[in-house]
Amino acid sequence: MKKLLLRSILTKHLKENVIFDICKLKNTHWKYGIKSQLNWFNKYIQDNDVHHLAYIKEKLVGYGLLRNRSFFYQKNKKKYLYYDTLVVSKKYRELQIGKKLSNLTVKTIKKLKLHSMLICEKKIVDFHEKYGWKKVNKEKPQILDHKYSKSLSMMCFNQKKIFMKRKIEYFIFS
């Protein structure tokens, strides 16, 4: 197997060429164009967001993103991690890089002692469940600054049981 190097880095420590490589890799899956990817990155990614980078021979082949965001629970503002992105280059998908990035993501969430939320296609719910993610009843949480399709699923990780029973109001973009 080719040697895989995993790195975790905050946005404020990313170099421009790495941001460009991230946007190129994301564009292989979400085909909006590099310029659009860069604009989105510059608009929505904050200094303390966590980027998980997977390299083989100095080439970025996998990427995960945890965005530091806030939610309201019983009128109190709290922090959480929005698991925004997991993408692996098609050429390298058989090397279990997605598994390694998912394990790193879970480890990071536990280390930061926060809960995390993601929105995904129903066809990949089983993948996330392997790493301890739980599907959430759509009536309990609400995303205040983003609409998402009913065909998608919301999942949470490291969430206290009390949060599962009451309404949570999430923010993704602020």
Language model features with spans:
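Terminal substrate-recognition subdomain of acyl/acetyltransferases
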Residues: 1-3, 9-14, 119-174
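Short loop segments at secondary-structure junctions
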Residues: 56-58, 91-92, 157-162
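Short acidic (Asp/Glu) patches
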Residues: 67-68, 101-105, 135-140
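Short coil/turn motifs at secondary-structure junctions
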Residues: 69-71, 91, 123
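Conserved acetyl-CoA-binding loop-helix of GNAT-fold acetyltransferases
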Residues: 88, 94-107
